Every structure is written in C-alpha cells, then in structure tokens.
C-alpha cells in the first residue's frame, strides 16, 4: 500500500474508489494499491 498525496491510476485495471472519506486505488496488481494520506 503506497500512501501518497495524489493517487493516480497506473494501469487500465486500477479503480479509484472512496472508502470512509479516503481516496484509494484498488487493482488486480497488488503493487498498484494506493491510499491518499
């Protein structure tokens, strides 16, 4: 899980979602998991 000030989609499988007021990226590739923090 990468925590960065700006989250971006890395590949076409990445999905940007909001969970509990946090913007997150979930993907089939676990290395692409990101959270805005």
Curated annotation (Swiss-Prot):
UniProt-listed GO biological process terms: translation
Cellular component GO terms, alphabetical: cytoplasm; ribonucleoprotein complex; ribosome
Transport among keywords: no
Keyword Transferase among UniProt keywords: no
Protein name in the entry: Large ribosomal subunit protein bL36
Entries under Pfam families matching the protein: Ribosomal_L36
UniProt entry keywords in alphabetical sequence: Ribonucleoprotein, Ribosomal protein
Gene Ontology MF terms in the entry: structural constituent of ribosome
InterPro entries: Ribosomal_bL36, Ribosomal_bL36_sp
Family listed: Belongs to the bacterial ribosomal protein bL36 family.
Domain of life of the native organism: Bacteria
The organism's taxonomic lineage, starting at the top: Bacteria, Bacillati, Actinomycetota, Actinomycetes, Bifidobacteriales
């Amino acid at each position: 899980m990468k925590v960065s000030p700006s989250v971006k989609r890395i590949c076409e499988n990445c999905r940007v979602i909001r969970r509990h007021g946090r913007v997150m990226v979930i993907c089939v590739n676990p290395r692409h998991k990101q959270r805005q923090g």
